[in-house]
Design a protein with these regions (language model features):
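Conserved donor-nucleotide/metal-binding helix-loop-beta segment in metal-dependent transferases, i.e.
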Residues: 84, 105-130
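Conserved donor nucleotide-binding strand/loop of the catalytic core
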Residues: 64-77, 87
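Basic phosphate/pyrophosphate-binding loop/patch that engages nucleotide-derived ligands
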Residues: 88, 111-122, 141-157, 167
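N-terminal glycine-rich phosphate-binding loop and ensuing alpha1 helix
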Residues: 2-49
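Acidic donor-binding segment of Leloir-type glycosyltransferases
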Residues: 38-70
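Conserved alpha/beta core of the MobA/IspD/sugar-nucleotide pyrophosphorylase nucleotidyltransferase superfamily
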Residues: 140, 159-240
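Conserved nucleotide-sugar donor-binding
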Residues: 91-92, 136-149, 193-197
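Short beta-strand-to-loop acidic/aromatic patch adjacent to the donor-nucleotide binding site
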Residues: 86, 90-101
């Protein structure tokens, strides 16, 4: 079964432009994320899906240097970008990751894929009530992706890719992967300068000691240094 990770990435972010190529310790956030994604066991290719615009040429150049596949499509119609990329790379199952999650845990991705395969759901996502923002994983079939691409023209569905799935539970079986963890109050995503500040602190403290640090290591670090999480505690997650 060809299970591919597709990462959506672009430079033209409204709240923090160029965030995916912001650097910590001489490496971009996208490099850190791709390094982590390469440790996922249950997948084949990693594909970075960006836009057709020249502003995103540096993303493609970075991926070329790192030998990571890319696809270029619509900026606003992200659903079509995913659908086209999945067909081009012959994916049967898609793992959706966004580039604003640079510290995504590869072991969490593997466990989510295992859960999806074992339980035969149409769509699986990590539980937002369990994990920090920034540990967001979605798994679904390319067939479902093509169905959504053909059947919905709602702007929210086109921009955010997967609302069509979880807003139609009568048509699709929806699964949520969770563990015995209460960490949803932390923000490990990068939407704002404050978010970047926290990620910078974590990378500077964790990466030099252990390039393969995981979510457990991050949480231990935040529990030991609770003041760090105050940096972006006030940031409100955008509602879809």
């Amino acid at each position: 079964m060809s299970t591919h990770i597709i990462v959506q990435a672009r430079m033209n972010s409204s709240r923090l432009p160029g965030k995916v190529l912001k650097e910590v310790l001489g490496k971009t956030l996208l490099e850190y994320q791709l390094e982590r994604l390469k440790r996922v066991i249950n997948t084949g290719k990693i594909i970075v899906a960006t836009t057709i615009y020249p502003i995103d040429d540096p993303i493609v150049a970075l991926c070329n240097r790192l030998s990571v596949s890319t696809y270029r499509g619509s900026e606003s119609d992200v659903l079509s970008r995913y659908a086209e990329a999945s067909i081009l790379f012959l994916s049967q199952t898609v793992v959706r990751i966004t580039a604003d999650c640079p510290l995504i845990d590869p072991m969490l991705i593997d466990r989510t894929i295992d859960f999806y395969r074992r339980c035969s759901f149409d769509y699986v996502s990590t539980d937002h009530a369990t994990y920090p923002r920034g540990m967001d994983v979605e798994v679904f079939s390319t067939d479902m992706l093509q169905m959504a691409n053909s059947n919905t023209m709602q702007p929210t569905d086109r921009e955010h890719v997967t609302p069509y799935f979880y807003q139609n539970p009568d048509r699709f079986s929806i699964g949520t992967y969770s563990e015995d963890l209460q960490a949803s109050h932390y923000r490990l995503t990068v939407d704002t300068p404050e978010d970047f500040q926290l990620i910078q602190i974590l990378l500077e403290n964790l990466y030099p000691k252990n390039h393969k640090f995981n979510l457990e290591d991050i949480l231990k670090c935040l529990q030991k240094n609770p003041q760090w999480s105050y940096v972006n505690q006030h940031i409100v997650q955008k509602i879809i």
